[in-house]
């Protein structure tokens, strides 16, 4: 039997091609470069250095413009002519300012400083103040009280008012316990705080420090400070005074 060979035509179409809308796109990145193409720089704006570099002009020479050339110009300049021209210009400006001041008049009833752009002042300035005082003079001082009867009433009126009394106790003051029924009788301490009719007193005695509250009636203000060693030593003060009096007596 004769063998028959059947040849199948091969379809040679690209695999990685897309025929969407009749366009073919290559998805292979073999021939594509990673970096974008360089942009061409526009040559429209180019800066050109037109000035010259002169060290003496940059540094200023001896403090004048253009260095040595500036000094020569200053030496050749005529100062008298410039002074005359400047004086003439100043006179013209003064005349113009005087004319403007004469044209600008402030009424006496108006606020001068407010009209000129400032604040405050009296209406009409000093003239307005004088006219106001003339029209509204200050009231005369009250006459002294006539003396009636004895001089006691006059002395009473001449006395100065008394200064207000200080409160009984304030924080920082020194107080002593005057309640004989209290175990802290004649103890002396420093007032720390006062609330609701009571005061907290700090007794300092070396290692013995204690803060105790008392009623205001139980305490009395004291000028002399508390003893440094023992707060109970205040009890001995009257005894020491009595002993000193007995020793001083013959």
UniProtKB/Swiss-Prot annotation:
Positions with biased composition (Pro residues): 136-146
Cross-link position per record: Glycyl lysine isopeptide (Lys-Gly) (interchain with G-Cter in ubiquitin): 52
Range of the transit peptide: 1-48
The keyword Ribosomal protein appears for this protein: no
Compositionally biased region (Basic and acidic residues): 76-94, 106-115
Enzyme Commission number(s) of this protein: 7.1.1.-
Main location: plastid
Phenotype seen when the gene is deleted: Malfunction of the NDH complex.
Region (Disordered): 76-163, 222-250
Catalytic activity: a plastoquinone + NADH + (n+1) H(+)(in) = a plastoquinol + NAD(+) + n H(+)(out); a plastoquinone + NADPH + (n+1) H(+)(in) = a plastoquinol + NADP(+) + n H(+)(out)
GO molecular function terms listed in the Swiss-Prot or TrEMBL record: quinone binding
Transport keyword on record: yes
Gene3D superfamilies: 2.30.30.140
Cystine pairs: none
Gene Ontology biological-process annotations: photosynthetic electron transport chain
Keywords, ordered alphabetically: Chloroplast, Isopeptide bond, Membrane, NAD, NADP, Plastid, Plastoquinone, Quinone, Thylakoid, Transit peptide, Translocase, Transport, Ubl conjugation
Family annotation (Pfam families): NdhS
Recorded topology in the membrane: Peripheral membrane protein
GO CC terms, sorted: chloroplast; chloroplast thylakoid; chloroplast thylakoid membrane; cytosol; NAD(P)H dehydrogenase complex (plastoquinone)
Source organism superkingdom: Eukaryota
Localization of this protein: Plastid, Chloroplast thylakoid membrane
InterPro entries associated with the record: NdhS
Function field: NDH shuttles electrons from NAD(P)H:plastoquinone, via FMN and iron-sulfur (Fe-S) centers, to quinones in the photosynthetic chain and possibly in a chloroplast respiratory chain. The immediate electron acceptor for the enzyme in this species is believed to be plastoquinone. Couples the redox reaction to proton translocation, and thus conserves the redox energy in a proton gradient. Required for the efficient operation of ferredoxin-dependent plastoquinone reduction. Forms the electron donor-binding subcomplex in association with the NDHT and NDHU subunits.
Subunit description: Part of the chloroplast NDH complex, composed of a mixture of chloroplast and nucleus encoded subunits. Component of the electron donor-binding subcomplex, at least composed of NDHS, NDHT and NDHU. Interacts with the NDH subcomplex A via the protein NDHT and NDHU.
Protein known as: NAD(P)H-quinone oxidoreductase subunit S, chloroplastic
The species this protein was found in: Arabidopsis thaliana (Mouse-ear cress)
Gene behind this protein: ndhS
């Amino acid at each position: 039997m004769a063998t028959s060979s059947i040849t199948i035509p091969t379809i040679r179409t690209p695999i990685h091609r897309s025929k969407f809308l009749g366009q073919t796109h290559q998805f292979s990145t073999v021939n594509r470069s990673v970096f974008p193409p360089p942009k061409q720089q526009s040559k429209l704006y180019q800066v050109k250095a037109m000035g010259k570099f002169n060290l003496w002009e940059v540094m200023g020479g001896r403090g004048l413009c253009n260095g040595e050339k500036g000094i020569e110009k200053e030496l050749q300049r005529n100062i008298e002519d410039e002074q005359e021209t400047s004086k003439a210009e100043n006179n013209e400006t003064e005349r113009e300012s005087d004319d403007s001041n004469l044209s600008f008049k402030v009424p006496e009833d108006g606020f001068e400083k407010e009209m000129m752009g400032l604040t405050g002042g009296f209406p009409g300035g000093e003239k307005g103040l004088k006219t106001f005082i003339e029209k509204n003079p200050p009231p005369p001082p009250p006459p002294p009280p006539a003396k009636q009867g004895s001089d006691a009433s006059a002395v009473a009126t001449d006395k100065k008012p008394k200064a207000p009394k200080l409160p009984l106790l304030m924080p920082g003051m020194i107080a002593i316990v005057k309640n004989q029924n209290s175990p802290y009788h004649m103890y002396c301490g420093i007032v720390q705080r006062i609330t609701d009719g009571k005061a907290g007193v700090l007794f300092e005695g070396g290692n013995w420090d204690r803060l105790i509250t008392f009623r205001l009636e139980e305490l009395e203000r004291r000028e002399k400070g508390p003893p440094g060693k023992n707060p109970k030593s205040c009890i001995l003060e009257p005894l020491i005074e009595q002993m000193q009096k007995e020793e001083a007596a013959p």
